[in-house]
């Protein structure tokens, strides 16, 4: 393995990316063969899955932050209307609002920002399998020298297996419009590269569109009405998917597979996380309803008397004592004058004329 670490480069990105890809490659190569096209393709795809699994919690925070941002839209609009001309006061009020609700907009960007260096690192590692073309940051090697040179954690033998891997003559490290460095591959057929890359490229664009569509569909009406949000929605729905299709011919097949796998994972994870959050919100609503129902009085029940208030003023207790004495007098029959207080439930006596 070529482990010459350069602290003044992006090796801190290149080595982890190549190591994760190398682990998955060795696993699939043991089952499919070291020069198998699908062993290398699956290693790239599972590199994506590993990264996205590590970013699962930040992704959930991103979704919660996005939903919280939508809930705060009415208050943000009110601040914009009130302090629209005073940018400094507007910024202070926005920070105050974010602190009150525990809102951190940086968390919403973390998963996206974390994927950028990984994408650049993977692109560089894949380019480094074929160093016969030279270019920015790449040595210009001969075909023989290239096969005898390792690629970060990949050995020279692994480099040879990568250059040999192809599907119907389409090397996994080649791209449709490639004109140089073709001698490094054992087999190269441009029609085969187009035939393999075009369907994956279209699927990656379609997956990008459906991901964007799912995100836009879950936006609140207030957020969708925002002009900036509306513009970003149009870019996400139409420009980004089209960019994948247009840029596909200039990217290696492995990068197109990376983009396709990333969008497939995002689509599934997005639906799972949104469903989980909706269930949590529904459970909170049901808990609140049950709490209110438990505290509410039963239908037809009389309100409870405040015994403390009665004991404090002594009125009810004093008023109840004569009645109790009169009742006892009636029961004993020893009172001088019969009580005129009717017994509870007794019918009133008719007065004789």
UniProtKB/Swiss-Prot annotation:
Gene Ontology biological process terms from the UniProt entry: protein insertion into membrane; protein transport
**Residue ranges, annotated region (Disordered):** 285-353
Pfam families listed in its UniProt record: 60KD_IMP
According to the record's subunit comment, the protein's assembly and interactions are: Interacts with the Sec translocase complex via SecD. Specifically interacts with transmembrane segments of nascent integral membrane proteins during membrane integration.
Listed PANTHER family: CYTOCHROME C OXIDASE ASSEMBLY PROTEIN COX18, MITOCHONDRIAL, OXA1
Which GO MF terms are attached to this record?
A: membrane insertase activity
What is this protein called in UniProt? Membrane protein insertase YidC
What span is annotated as the signal peptide, if there is one?
none
